[in-house]
């Protein structure tokens, strides 16, 4: 019998396997598709590769602004996809080598939980003192909306071999705005349809409104607070009807309405595991109601992020090894949307902080006062939220490259830093990171390149 049998080789599963192996535990890692899961093959990595290609396209267009003679002459999707697949391939090869170098039994095939301590794959049974469920997620659709032909999810959109003339995107969350950003840079006429009142609705309202202004400026059309009714496709394109009666027409429809847990027909319910709408329920130590069965990643309710999966996988390995690791604060997990402009945040929004703490202070530092942001030609801001006379409880940013600032932001939040403590740290000039220091100087009552 093995110490751990892990079902699923995505971010959560393989992180658990690697850490458990480091700790001297015997590990079986089972994956039906490719090691690395959604993030590496159909999510984070390929989308960010497309977003970088989009940034290069925009740079070519804007060269004259900097005195550089450059023009944008179109997109060759076969070369874009070759670049994207090359990035994936190199990372995949590296990950395979990493798993192979550890004492991990890697099993290819579709596994099913057949007992509280056993998974069956290809007719073979693997028993473990502990089971870790890490089967990930799939791209959702809406009832009655079949994914076929010109109606697609991110899975199909990532392998498109042409640039559509126009696209409708159903969903204005992270996936929707990232694809809107890529396609607009590639020259596509894009319309985003979002049922909630704002784009990126999970973000602080100030950030959502700034994103909407930026999208208007980029020529990305969007409709918020409107509901989808139906879609019909023909040889030329897709017609989308909204509940308001308005119809939209485009070459294709991207359904970006979130991701669902991949837990059907895997034996979870049959073994008595508590579920809710397909998600596996756990306590704060990621243990299910069945002894010695744990769950990590997208099947656990909460943020569906690869780095959350990594951390949960490491946590469970250490928990099983008896190290009693510190529980994970979900609010302290950084969130980044890699559109143009980028959005990055951690902690509570202003509205959430008011609800939780009552009295708060907030401050927005405009990137207009930041030298490096002026050099890059970006606009945006860093918004800080603090408890009244207390630590910083939220950092919310929008602007080019602000995702690179989230590292310091997550230290500030997770170490419960006061604005005055961050203000005393010296930030290099001229960097965008300097804006983080300036924001904290201002919030602690001693603004430098900012109005109080």
Residue ranges and their predicted role:
Residues 5-7, 111, 126-136, 169-170, ...:
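Short hydrophobic core segments
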């Amino acid at each position: 019998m093995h110490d751990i049998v892990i079902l699923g080789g995505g971010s959560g599963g393989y992180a658990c396997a690697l850490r458990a192996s480091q700790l001297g535990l015997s590990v079986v890692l089972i994956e039906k598709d490719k090691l690395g899961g959604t993030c590496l093959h159909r999510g984070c990595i390929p989308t960010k590769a497309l977003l970088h290609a989009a940034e290069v396209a925009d740079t070519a267009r804007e060269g004259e602004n900097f005195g550089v003679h450059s023009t944008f002459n179109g997109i060759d999707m076969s070369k874009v996809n070759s670049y994207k697949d090359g990035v994936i391939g190199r990372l995949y090869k590296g990950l395979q080598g990493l798993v192979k170098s550890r004492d991990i039994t890697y099993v290819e095939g579709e596994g099913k939980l057949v007992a509280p301590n056993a998974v069956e794959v290809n007719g073979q049974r693997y028993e473990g003192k502990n089971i870790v469920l890490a089967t990930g997620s799939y791209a959702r659709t809406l009832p009655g909306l079949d994914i076929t032909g010109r109606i697609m999810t991110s899975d199909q959109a990532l392998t498109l071999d042409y640039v559509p003339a126009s696209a409708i995107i159903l969903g204005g969350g992270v996936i929707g705005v990232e694809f809107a950003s890529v396609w607009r840079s590639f020259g596509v006429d894009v319309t985003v349809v979002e049922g909630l009142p704002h784009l990126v609705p999970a973000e602080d309202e100030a950030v959502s409104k700034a994103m909407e202004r930026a999208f208007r400026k980029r020529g990305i059309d969007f409709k918020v607070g409107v509901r989808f009714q139906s879609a019909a496709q023909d040889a030329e394109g897709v017609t989308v009807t909204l509940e308001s009666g308005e119809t939209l027409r485009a070459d294709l429809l991207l359904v970006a309405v979130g991701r669902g847990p991949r837990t059907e027909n895997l034996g979870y319910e049959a073994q008595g595991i508590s579920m809710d709408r397909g998600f596996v329920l756990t306590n704060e130590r990621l243990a299910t109601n069945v002894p010695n069965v744990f769950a990590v990643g997208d099947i656990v309710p909460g943020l569906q992020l690869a780095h959350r999966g990594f951390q949960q996988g490491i946590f469970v390995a250490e928990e099983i090894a008896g190290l009693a690791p510190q529980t994970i604060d979900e609010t302290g997990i950084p969130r980044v949307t890699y559109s143009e402009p980028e959005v990055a945040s951690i902690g509570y929004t202003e509205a959430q902080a008011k609800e939780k703490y009552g009295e708060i202070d907030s401050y927005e530092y405009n990137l207009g006062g930041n030298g490096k942001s002026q050099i890059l030609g970006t606009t945006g801001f860093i918004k800080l939220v603090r408890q009244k006379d207390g630590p910083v409880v939220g950092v919310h940013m929008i602007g080019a490259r602000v995702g690179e600032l989230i590292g310091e932001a997550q230290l500030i939040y997770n170490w419960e830093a006061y604005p005055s403590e961050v203000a005393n740290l010296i930030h290099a000039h001229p960097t965008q990171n300097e804006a983080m220091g300036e924001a904290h100087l201002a919030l602690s009552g001693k603004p430098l390149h900012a109005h109080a």
